[in-house]
Structures are given as structure tokens and as C-alpha cells.
Amino acid sequence: MGDSTTYTRLITNQEVEAFAAISGDHNPLHLDPDYAATTPFGECIAHGMLTGALISAAIAMQLPGPGSVYLSQSLQFKAPVFLGDTLTVTLTVIDKHAKRPWITLQCQVENQDGKAVAKGEAQVAAPTTQETVTVIPPPALQLIEAASLSEED
């Protein structure tokens, strides 16, 4: 217990757009600067679950790492994440199951100012052997405006 890791990522407009395309969450709060300007946030914010996905990345790639199986996650969103924010996920092992290779992780996500934007706990089935893997980079994504798709019809 007590093992810990951090994972840091810059949140860009391109990542927010890609997350919207993949998730199907096209809420204008995330994608339309004119709409977002009328909200209490005053500008576009990232999807909450994009922040949650960074926790998943830290679990899968760092602690416990490749071969991990995500069992459950509790998550509270504490503050908005704006485009251009740099988020740091901190995972800390707070419990180990006595008979199974399960661990509980405290999950904290902070922005570049040290402000908590999300926190929670994750239950993970850790691999029982050390996995050595070659990380294959994902394919490049190219977002195409929906309007340009209809022009090709």
C-alpha cells in the first residue's frame, strides 16, 4: 500500500472535439464558444468524463499498468476543466484485497494551479504477473467538419 504515480496531460480543443466525436456527447458547453460564453463558465469546458478517461489511462499504463482490469470507479467533479488546462492525475494505492489481486486506488486530478478538479476511488484487478508490453501509438485522428461531409453527398 502507498504506491503512487502521476500522469499529466494538456487538455486541447482537438482532444475535446475528438472526445465529443467518440462519445457522442455534443453538448454545446464543450464545443460552441458562443453558447459557452452565455453560461456561468464563460467559455468552453472539457467533458467531465474526458477527465475520468485520464484516470483510466494512468491505471492502464502506469499503476498497476498493462493488464489491469478496471472494476469500478467513484468520481466527483470538483471544478471545471478549461481548454489549455494541464491536468495531473495522482493515483495512490489505499487498500489491497486479502485473497484476490484487487487494489483500491485514491484518484485525484488537479489543474496546473493545484486546484482539485476531480477525485474518487477506483477498484482495479491488478495483473498477477509483471506485463512487459510494447506500446503501439494510436492511429492519427483527423476530425472532419460535419458540414463538409454533407457537401460530399
Q: Residue locations for each model-derived region?
A:
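Proline-rich low-complexity regions
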Residues: 28, 64, 80, 126-127
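HotDog/MaoC-like acyl-thioester-processing domains
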Residues: 1, 81-153
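Catalytic strand-loop segment that frames the active site of acyl-thioester-processing enzymes
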Residues: 1-46, 153
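Generic structural detector for well-ordered beta-strands
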Residues: 6-11, 76, 123-125
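Short, intrinsically disordered, mixed-charge
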Residues: 21-24, 60-64, 112
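Hydrophobic beta-strand-centered segment that forms part of the acyl-chain substrate-binding groove
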Residues: 37-46, 50-93
